[in-house]
Amino acid sequence: MKANNHFKDFAWKKCLLGASVVALLVGCSPHIIETNEVALKLNYHPASEKVQALDEKILLLRPAFQYSDNIAKEYENKFKNQTALKVEQILQNQGYKVISVDSSDKDDLSFSQKKEGYLAVAMNGEIVLRPDPKRTIQKKSEPGLLFSTGLDKMEGVLIPAGFVKVTILEPMSGESLDSFTMDLSELDIQEKFLKTTHSSHSGGLVSTMVKGTDNSNDAIKSALNKIFANIMQEIDKKLTQKNLESYQKDAKELKGKRNR
């Protein structure tokens, strides 16, 4: 009788231990490995040859960009700062002295800046990266004690959208002399991505042996590098000394009217 009781007691403890192990394993979240193989370089070298220097100053306002939610704040700041830096280099390459203004609003220019600036260059726009709905699929993990992975996946192609507008102003009057806009959706940029996130449930036993991969951040950085190069290439073509000097007459007239 005692032996039988010992056997029942052992079996009960074994059952409890097994249940505890199962509960522990089920409570563990699967591991997600985020790749970091792409650097956010944002490189561009002016393509046009350096021309003769002029005794004229151009005011460069800080870019005013908005970004989609999937672009990290640090990427936003670097994109904005590199845009200002490279446009400054492009203008210097065209023979102009550049005064960088720590504001994106033309109304914040001081009187002395308005007076000494031949032109002002302002930039605004939206930098958007979104999954192509025609080429992106989502797969959610189903709850389950055994075979649920506990991972939701989105796999597809990241494409750009939004715009960048460059406006050339006469600083004293604040009047626009010219502008051009780049439609980012027209750029041939397509980045494959796999975004993996934890499901609302913890997953089953198999989830402890599953490792998810997420390369969506690398796809974003790669796309931003290409968007940046395309934007700079277009600005380099437009902001030439020949084009900028064509506003000479109108700029003088507008500045003269405000000085009277």
From Swiss-Prot:
Where is the protein situated, by its record's location annotation? Cell outer membrane
Signal peptide: which range, if any?
1-27
Q: Tell whether Lipoprotein is among the UniProt keywords.
A: yes
Protein origin, superkingdom: Bacteria
The residue ranges crossing the membrane are none
Coiled-coil parts of chain: none
Give the InterPro entries listed for this entry. Answer: NeuraminylLac-bd_hemagglutn, NeuraminylLac-bd_hemagglutn_sf
Q: What is its main location?
A: membrane
What membrane topology is annotated for this entry?
Lipid-anchor
**What Gene Ontology cellular-component terms does the record carry?**
cell outer membrane
| Lipidated sites in chain (N-palmitoyl cysteine) | 28
Instruction: Give the lipid-moiety residues, type S-diacylglycerol cysteine.
Output: 28
Q: Does the keyword Methyltransferase apply?
A: no
The name on file for this protein is Neuraminyllactose-binding hemagglutinin
